[in-house]
Regions:
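Short, well-ordered beta-strand segments in beta-rich or mixed alpha/beta enzyme
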Residues: 49-52, 71-74, 99, 109-110
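Glycine- and acidic-residue-biased ligand/ion/polar-headgroup-sensing regions
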Residues: 54, 63-78
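Residues that flank catalytic or metal-binding motifs in active/ligand-binding sites
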Residues: 33, 67, 104
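Conserved short histidine dyad/triad with adjacent acidic residue
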Residues: 29-62, 92-96
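Short acidic-glycine-tyrosine-enriched beta hairpin
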Residues: 77-101
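Ligand-binding loop in jelly-roll beta-barrel domains
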Residues: 93-122
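A short, N-terminal "cap"/entry segment at the start of jelly-roll beta-barrel domains
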Residues: 1-44, 124-147
Length: 147
């Protein structure tokens, strides 16, 4: 029986997102690296693999969209206690986090539905969103091509 309507994508540029296992990590500091998996310009969502070496401290931040985290390996100290390899956490829109510390070398999958806003006692210090993640990926590709 034929389909009652045309189900082809309305936009021909729609495609899957594929990141190979051997794609290089983007080093952000001596203790922190990321691998960009997916960025959605349409929704503002993004997904990354994050690797923190033992002792890395992520600054205080607020989630301006829900986020999912799944620890692949390692251990993190978070406001609610300790997350271990195999743990999953959902962080709702609006949640505040104090500093998060890598108690061991840690790798985790992070999927975010918006902006993460960083702050200290006095002011906002920065943010991460789909645009900053996309720029991070583009700059890494340019740097790799220049090598």
């Amino acid at each position: 029986m034929p389909l009652p309507q045309d189900i082809r994508p309305a936009f021909q540029h729609i495609q899957d997102s594929l990141v190979r296992a051997d794609e290089p990590w983007i080093v952000q500091s001596p203790l922190a690296s990321r691998k960009v998996l997916w960025v959605s310009r349409e929704s503002g969502s993004w997904a990354v693999l994050i690797h923190w070496k033992k002792g890395y401290v992520a600054p205080a931040h607020k989630h301006l969209g829900g986020a999912h985290a799944y620890l692949i390996s390692g251990k993190l100290q978070v406001r609610d206690g300790v997350l271990n390899a195999g743990d999953y956490v959902y962080e709702p829109n609006g949640v505040l986090h104090d500093a998060t510390t890598a108690l061991e070398d840690t790798t985790y999958l992070f999927i975010c539905d918006g902006t993460v806003l960083y702050f200290n006692e006095d002011s906002f210090t920065g943010y991460t969103n789909w645009e900053t993640i996309e720029k991070l990926r583009e700059n890494a590709k340019l740097a790799q091509a220049a090598e």
